[in-house]
Design a protein with these regions (language model features):
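Non-catalytic accessory regions outside enzyme or core folds
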Residues: 1-41
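Class I SAM-dependent methyltransferase Rossmann-like catalytic core
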Residues: 24-28, 32-110, 122-130
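Class I S-adenosyl-L-methionine-dependent methyltransferase module
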Residues: 42, 61-62, 91, 108-214, ...
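Generic beta-strand/beta-sheet core signal
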Residues: 215, 237-239, 267
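Short amphipathic alpha-helix with an adjacent loop that forms part of the alpha/beta core around
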Residues: 220-229
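A short SAM/SAH-binding and catalytic strip from SAM-dependent methyltransferases
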Residues: 232-247
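C-terminal substrate-binding/active-site "lid" region of AdoMet-derived donor-dependent transferases
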Residues: 243-294
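Structural signal for terminal/edge beta-strands and the immediately following C-terminal loop/tail
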Residues: 285-311
Length: 311
């Protein structure tokens, strides 16, 4: 897929119906030969729409108007390029816990959670948040996470979590203003509700910080997993992380995680991990495949806003 095609796909499959601003901006970038040429000089993982838009917003540029966005980006390209080369798409969306919860609640309790690509670790608190699956509510915490669930009997209990750890090449801290500013820049412009969720989840994490370890998902995962307490069910999980990892490392990661005790929850786009005999997704929007120990269970929207259960 060319860089231009990736921006078209992002605009149509991810942003359409969710962020008119990013749909419009993605399609504008896809037609901008000069900007595409600058992006082409970067490694593929550094050309992502979310990363470019987040870096420009962090630097104070506008994303509301494609022309203003282009002017700012071209005028400040050295700073934009530096941000693209040094930062990563670390969207830390606690709403993803809503699609993880049905799987987590059904596992033997208590749980030792280990998130790969944890960012600031906000998805390590599924037991602290509240949830709404249509008319079904569970939990009493903040934030409240809404998920439109189809084909699913929602859980009637929260998981019991006794250990929380995250592995990331660049862990972020909710107590560091610069890190919070980057997390905020990654939230799409119209999504005020997600900004409120970020603040509420950040308060939870700051009051009981998780163990966040800087490291590689293949080389450093076994050592961190070995620190999980005895008597707890180890659960290694990740959401929208492996697309940033070269295919050979994805294969190596899958081999490592399968050899660990406990369970593996993956929540990745269709082309990232191989799955057999999947049903048709519910629509043309981008959906992740939610799987437990390699067995597909559901289609899930990337921010946890909806899921279609088929497992």
């Amino acid at each position: 897929m060319t860089t231009a095609e990736s921006y078209v796909e992002f605009g149509i499959r991810e942003a359409r119906g969710v962020s008119p601003t990013y749909e419009r901006l993605s399609l504008a970038v896809s037609r901008d030969e000069e900007l595409l040429a600058l992006l082409a000089a970067l490694p593929p993982a550094r050309r992502q729409p979310n990363l470019l838009f987040g870096v420009v917003r962090l630097l104070g540029g506008s994303v509301d108007d494609p022309a203003a966005f282009r002017d700012f980006t071209m005028a400040n390209w050295p700073a934009v390029e530096a941000g693209l080369r040094t930062r990563a798409t670390q969207t830390n969306e606690p709403g993803r816990c809503a699609v993880l919860l049905p799987v987590l609640a059904a596992l033997p309790q208590p749980l030792a959670l280990l998130e790969v690509g944890a960012s600031a670790g906000l998805c390590l608190y599924p037991d602290r948040y509240a949830y709404r699956y249509g008319d079904h509510a569970i939990g009493a915490g903040e934030p409240v996470l809404d998920c439109a669930a189809t084909g699913l009997t929602p859980p009637d209990r929260l998981p019991e979590v006794v250990w929380r750890a995250g592995l990331d090449l660049n862990p972020l801290r909710v107590t560091e203003p610069a890190d919070v500013a980057w997390l905020d820049a990654l939230i799409w412009p119209e999504h005020a509700h997600r900004r409120a969720r970020l603040r509420a989840a950040g308060t939870v994490a700051a009051s009981d910080p998780p163990l966040l370890v800087r490291g590689d998902l293949v080389d450093d995962l076994p050592a961190l997993a070995a620190r999980a307490p005895a008597g707890a069910t180890l659960v290694v999980f990740h959401t929208s992380v492996l697309y940033q990892v070269p295919v050979p490392r994805r294969v190596a990661f899958a081999d490592v995680v399968r050899r660990l005790p406990g369970h593996w929850i993956s929540n990745e786009s269709l082309d990232v991990l191989p799955h057999d005999a999947l049903p048709q997704p519910p629509d043309e929007a981008l959906h992740n495949v939610l799987a437990l120990d390699g067995r597909p269970l559901a289609w899930a929207r990337p921010h946890g806003q909806a899921m279609t259960w088929f497992g």
